[in-house]
């Protein structure tokens, strides 16, 4: 279950990729903007401030996240939709879409390469599609998670839940996919050298980060509190060795993959 408060503990670090992604979207005055995987709505509300005249739609599968989003949206600036992006129908909006944003979602959606062409088709000519996904599934934060899961008595249940890295392609794959369906494409990758917990307030800052994302599938399987505590303790200990605290905080490198595409005029 998604926990908005846990996820937002590192809001500044999580916001930066969104800002880098959307800075490359050149839409001037879009009429319809969709945020796929809007989460707690923090970034979606930024879109409403950037394009105040647009109809903004935030789509997410987590009722908990959408509840938080609605509470934050005191001005009713956004239409919040509870839906799975795999079954979400762009035609339900009744008009072509000008901008589709997907920030840090598609790693959870293994089928996204076959969904992207449909989203591009739903764009108005000249419309924009922008996506960002983590590319750090071979980093210690993830390899150690799989190692601890493999040693668990419930490895058979845990390991199948930890295959998100297989859903994420290398940057060139997204370039060829989007260029092949009639888009002008900008694809890049960045490794952020993140400094977590500079004030040394957390026992394990990388563990706190993963509790908001990567660790969630494990916690979904391990319902027993003792099982959870044992797993988290073993994983946390391994993380402290892989990411030792420095005098200025804990360095947590994080690779991310970006793709921004503009649908060429004259294509529908």
Model-found features: residue ranges?
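Conserved catalytic/acceptor-binding region of the Class I
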Residues: 113, 126-198
């Amino acid at each position: 279950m998604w926990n908005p408060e846990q996820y937002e503990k590192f809001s500044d670090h999580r916001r930066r990729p969104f800002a880098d992604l959307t800075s490359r979207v050149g839409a001037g005055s879009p009429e319809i903007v969709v945020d796929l995987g809007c989460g707690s709505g923090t970034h979606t509300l930024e879109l409403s401030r950037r394009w105040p005249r647009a109809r903004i739609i935030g789509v997410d599968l987590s009722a908990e996240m959408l509840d938080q989003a609605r509470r934050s949206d005191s001005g009713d600036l956004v239409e919040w939709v509870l839906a799975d992006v795999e079954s979400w129908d762009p035609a339900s909006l009744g008009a072509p879409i000008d901008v589709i944003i997907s920030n840090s979602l598609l790693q959870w959606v293994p089928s996204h390469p076959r969904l992207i062409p449909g989203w591009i088709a739903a764009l108005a000519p000249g419309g924009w599609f922008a996506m960002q996904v983590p590319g750090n599934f071979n980093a210690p934060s993830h390899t150690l998670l799989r190692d601890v899961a493999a040693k668990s008595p419930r490895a058979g249940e845990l390991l199948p839940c930890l295959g998100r890295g297989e859903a994420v392609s290398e940057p060139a794959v997204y370039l060829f996919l989007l260029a092949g369906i009639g888009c002008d494409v900008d694809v890049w990758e960045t490794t952020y050298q993140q400094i977590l917990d500079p004030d040394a307030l957390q026992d394990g800052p990388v563990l706190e980060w993963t509790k908001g994302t990567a660790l969630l599938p494990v916690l979904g399987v391990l319902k027993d509190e003792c099982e959870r505590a044992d797993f988290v303790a073993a994983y946390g200990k391994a993380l402290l060795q892989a990411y030792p605290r420095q005098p200025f905080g804990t360095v947590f490198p994080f690779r991310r993959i970006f793709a921004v595409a503009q649908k060429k005029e004259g294509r529908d």
